[in-house]
Amino acid sequence: MKRLDQVLAADGVNAELELVIKDVMVACKDIAYKLGQGELAGILGATEDENVQGETQKMLDVISNDLLKDILVANPYVRGVGSEEEDYTIAGNADGKYLVTFDPLDGSSNIDVNLSVGTIFSVLEAQDDQSGDNQEVFLQNGRKQVAAGYVLYGPSSLLVMTTGNGVNLFTLDTNIGEFVLTKEALQIPEDTAEFAINMSNQRFWEPEMKQYIDDCLLGEEGPLAKRYNMRWVASMVAEVHRILIRGGIFMYPYDNRDPSKAGKLRLMYEGNPMSMIVEQAGGASSTGRMDIMDVAPQGIHDRVPVVLGSKNEVAKVVAYHTK
């Protein structure tokens, strides 16, 4: 089986970017180990702090964030890092070529009940000579990403990533401590009858999203003429992974609980990297009205509505929002 570094070399990834990705994996392997220890290591539960998003931080949120941040700012090729858990971007090497953004532990509300969580990351090229602690250097749309991926910590630890040449899946071989290639060129089925959404928020959605879900629930007799199944794990990494393997559509739409927020999920840490992965696997991603990766970020913590997965189903949701 091919190791990660062999696959990156075959894809023509340069040595600098390869080292950045490998450092992300060093941190993720450490996170996987700590998650496996769980209560034995005394690292479950919440802190008394909130992150910049206003969310109570789990202890493993903080630990995972520090592992990724510390190894990346020490990398000679990293200009700066941005994290969902940090108020501001952080400078790395002034001569670094790359910027890395990440959600250190997506779905962390699942930790204490031993359900799947994950790490999401995105790599951009620094476009000018500004320092990495200036967020302006990060404000590029998702089309500018040179790599994106996630690590799913489940029964096995899986890396799914793209450098713009398709999507590959790697499994962490704990015997050798390396991610090895186990599936190549993942492709999302174009059609689906499975959706993932948090139905408890339905009363807050826009009318277009309400109508789409209502039509899904009408089954074969409804306008969509399908019997749909619903899934919800409360972990974007787990939801997207299921879609990559068997198809489906994931939605976290705009809701009106806080009109000042464009959505729940963060563009730079979740929307863009997951959109790159999904589109590279033949799927589609949208806010409901435009492609997520075409959204111009105004701030490092911008939020965005998310609809992604099997491309024909995403097109149906977009049609509801644009007719």
Curated annotation (Swiss-Prot):
Q: Name one GO biological process term.
A: gluconeogenesis
Q: Which residues bind substrate?
A: D106, G107, S108, S109, N198, K264
Per UniProt, the enzyme's principal EC class comes to hydrolase
Q: Which UniProt keywords apply?
A: Carbohydrate metabolism, Cytoplasm, Hydrolase, Magnesium, Metal-binding
Asked if Ribosomal protein is a keyword of the record, the answer is: no
Q: Name one GO molecular function term.
A: fructose 1,6-bisphosphate 1-phosphatase activity
Give the cofactor note.
Binds 2 magnesium ions per subunit.
Please list the residues that bind Mg(2+) 2: D103, D106, E270
Q: What is its main location?
A: cytoplasm
Recorded E.C. number(s)?
3.1.3.11
Instruction: Tell me where in or outside the cell this protein is found.
Output: Cytoplasm
Pathway involvement of the protein, from the record? Carbohydrate biosynthesis; gluconeogenesis
Task: Quote any Pfam family the record assigns.
Answer: FBPase
Catalytic activity from the UniProt record:
beta-D-fructose 1,6-bisphosphate + H2O = beta-D-fructose 6-phosphate + phosphate
**Which Gene Ontology CC terms are recorded?**
cytosol
Q: Which cofactor does it need?
A: Mg(2+)
**Residues the entry annotates as binding Mg(2+) 1:** E84, D103, L105
Similarity comment text for this entry: Belongs to the FBPase class 1 family.
Listed under subunit, the entry gives:
Homotetramer.
Question: What is the protein named?
Answer: Fructose-1,6-bisphosphatase class 1
Q: What is the source species?
A: Hydrogenovibrio crunogenus (strain DSM 25203 / XCL-2) (Thiomicrospira crunogena)
Phylogenetic lineage:
Bacteria, Pseudomonadati, Pseudomonadota, Gammaproteobacteria, Thiotrichales
